[in-house]
Amino acid sequence: MTDKKIIVQFTMLTFFIAFLVSGALIALGPFGYSVHNWVHTFQQFMMNIPFAIYILSPAIASYIVLKKNKKVANFMEWLKTVFYVKNSLFPYLFVVAGLALYFAIHIAVSGRTEMALPFYTLLLSLPGNLIIGGLEEAGWMYILQPKLSKKNGFVLSSIFTGIIWTAWHIPLFFIPGTNHGEGLINFWMFAVQVMAFRFFYGAIYTISGKGRVFMCVLFHTMFNAASPIFGTTTMTWAGTITANAAMVLVSIVTVVMYDKKHES
């Protein structure tokens, strides 16, 4: 009952924060509000703050709900779990391999090898993508998907979380200045990727021990930082289906092998 209560509280609070803030930003669009992917002025930085609150809604809800239900004593305890980096080398290699596999398949299928941005921009954008992107997993993978997995198993919990995550992303396609809102990202391709990636996050969580939440945060951060570098390379249906099918397959095989190893 406690897990179910926490899931419901977390999901409701996440969507309340997300849709309240994003709704306000959409309403302010005609009056000049816009998100800025690259910040050059203090004004642009300030305009990104409310957008960051929307994106951080799963993390905000995670702490509030866990604190309310006495699952964490204070913010520092919550933060230590989210940023527990003392892991074995294998989960780090798995995260990097997942990124390499995804983008390599897209490049192979699309036949495009040019980069839209220099590779060093990945490093420059990591801090921003930690806040606007990576820390979502402090909610999705600290509370929602793991607790759903306890009752429903790996596959169904990945699907259920993917559906919720897709719905949570919908306002992005209406907020001025986002790649989604500017038409640079196809909603249905994005939905396929979102659903597939929940399987990969589930696999990361399964193999990563005490640092499981951080490893999911790391993958999300690195993926968001890497995506702009490849530009439209990832925007083909052939690549979308092939790359995401591969991610799902790798995830399922990884979890099955892990479970068999730890049962024996």
Regions found by a protein language model. Give the residues of each.
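Membrane-interfacial alpha-helical segments at the cytosolic side of multi-pass membrane proteins
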Residues: 28-30, 143-151, 179, 230
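Membrane-helix boundary elements
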Residues: 155-182
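Active-site His/Glu-centered metal-binding helix of metallohydrolases
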Residues: 20, 134-139, 143-144, 148, ...
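Membrane-interface helix/loop boundary segments of multi-pass membrane proteins
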Residues: 135-164, 203-211
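Short juxtamembrane and helix-loop transition motifs at transmembrane-helix boundaries
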Residues: 118-125, 173-183, 203-208
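Residue-level signature of the transmembrane alpha-helical core
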Residues: 15, 56, 96, 122, ...
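Functionally important transmembrane alpha-helices
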Residues: 183-245
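Specific transmembrane helices
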Residues: 4-133, 228-264
